[in-house]
Amino acid sequence: MKLAYWMYAGPAHIGTLRIASSFKNVHGIMHAPLGDDYFNVMRSMLERERDFTPVTASIVDRHVLARGSQEKVVDNIIRKDTEEHPDLIVLTPTCTSSILQEDLQNFVRRASLSTTADVLLADVNHYRVNELQAADRTLEQIVQFYIDKARRQGTLGTSKTPTPSVNIIGITTLGFHNQHDCRELKQLMADLGIQVNLVIPAAATVHDLQRLPQAWFNLVPYREIGGLTAQYLEREFGQPSVRITPMGVVETARCIRAIQGVLNAQGAGVNYEAFIEQQTREVSQAAWFSRSIDCQNLTGKKAVVFGDNTHAAAMTKILSREMGIHVVWAGTYCKYDADWFRAEVAGFCDEVLITDDHTVVGDAIARVEPAAIFGTQMERHVGKRLNIPCGVIAAPIHIQDFPVGYRPFLGYEGTNQLVDLIYNSFTLGMEDHLLEIFGGHDTKAVIHKGLSADSDLTWTAAGLAELNKIPGFVRGKVKRNTEKFAREQGISEITVEVLYAAKEAVGA
């Protein structure tokens, strides 16, 4: 647990509540003090959904601290069962309320004696894991609970469907373009002649979970959420899984070939090579674009990539392998899974950055001065400050990255969206000069605050005025070189004279 100005992955209870609110007719109750209960507001603001967020906060206040939580938590569970009639109620503490060290499992047992709904306590260590790890574990816990329940009741469907079928695991609320990706994956499966058995947790009910073993295989499109569930189903039912993210032309083809191998091992006798060839040549514009003059203009340009494991690794490979862009460094904030990330991006970038500190990321961007950034909402802010364009490719994200229109990142339509994102993220040709001539920049003033909080330099008004006269496409570089020169010389205030001295010294 730490106090942070910005977090890439939220605390564990956010992951648990993302899973609970993704299912249909499941209610989440968080045992939390005021301040930890922002999930409802965040989801209501960001997700383009008509329904209210099915989450209730059982507030830890002074009365609870004096008397204990049992009465309040149990009453809230029973009240929500009566009001909402959910199939399942998931109780989760937050990292703050976990400090109380209360026996919440006992509260759940007490409440379940008086409820029609099943009641589960999220089996998550709130001190040790983040949002993504908690979401992965909570999904596995719910699946395991209902598989075991169906097995006891004799309603578990274990016989495979007559034709090839798939479970798509890991599509959640507040996921990066998850709903668009899900639609694209369903279309891809239909094109391959594969029936979608279940999509979980998004839009599924807990009663559907007993049908999970009927699918021929599981597809886990995201590294972060769904892996534990797929491993559980493989252990219990020998159900194979495909864990290749179909993002970009090469990886989409690799994913389809892996699916082909899984199906043929079960006697399906399918061959998808003609489909891959046709999609790559005629449907996806990415392969054609990568050979066009527009893409050749990007060859050798420098870029940096930062995000979760899934999107940062896939984007690094697309930029380097499919578009010839030089990835100076690629990074992830998923420190718990760093070895997988290093192996994935090996050979596709010069350096690897593993951190969840946004100031380290910002300083790394400023150090290499790339032509474009591909990252999260935070890297977008960094890009604004450094006058470097940024394409957002991973959560955490703000409202503009929950588009109403169709914007998948996976599959063959996803490759087209990625081409547009990459191409439009670079400042091209005369664009910057035209913006200088005709206006259109967000601001004419140079933001002179450093990226790190401990910036020790100030610019005089005359120095800033002189800096503003420099064309925009090199202004950022001149500014950084001047500040570097000033630090080396022990100068704390940058004047016009310092600017010119730096220019002579470093050729800025």
Curated annotation (Swiss-Prot):
The keyword Iron-sulfur applies. Belongs to the ChlB/BchB/BchZ family. HAMAP family: ChlB_BchB. The keyword Chloroplast does not apply. It holds the Pfam family PCP_red. [4Fe-4S] cluster binds at D36. GO terms for biological process: light-independent chlorophyll biosynthetic process; photosynthesis, dark reaction. PANTHER family: LIGHT-INDEPENDENT PROTOCHLOROPHYLLIDE REDUCTASE SUBUNIT B. This is Light-independent protochlorophyllide reductase subunit B. Pathway: Porphyrin-containing compound metabolism; chlorophyll biosynthesis (light-independent). Component of the dark-operative protochlorophyllide reductase (DPOR) that uses Mg-ATP and reduced ferredoxin to reduce ring D of protochlorophyllide (Pchlide) to form chlorophyllide a (Chlide). This reaction is light-independent. The NB-protein (ChlN-ChlB) is the catalytic component of the complex. Keywords: 4Fe-4S, ATP-binding, Chlorophyll biosynthesis, Iron, Iron-sulfur, Metal-binding, Nucleotide-binding, Oxidoreductase, Photosynthesis. Protochlorophyllide reductase is composed of three subunits; ChlL, ChlN and ChlB. Forms a heterotetramer of two ChlB and two ChlN subunits. It catalyses: chlorophyllide a + oxidized 2[4Fe-4S]-[ferredoxin] + 2 ADP + 2 phosphate = protochlorophyllide a + reduced 2[4Fe-4S]-[ferredoxin] + 2 ATP + 2 H2O. Its EC number is 1.3.7.7. The active site is at D294. One of its GO terms (molecular function) is 4 iron, 4 sulfur cluster binding. It comes from the Bacteria. Binds 1 [4Fe-4S] cluster per heterodimer. The cluster is bound at the heterodimer interface by residues from both subunits. Substrate binds at G429, M430. Its cofactor is [4Fe-4S] cluster.
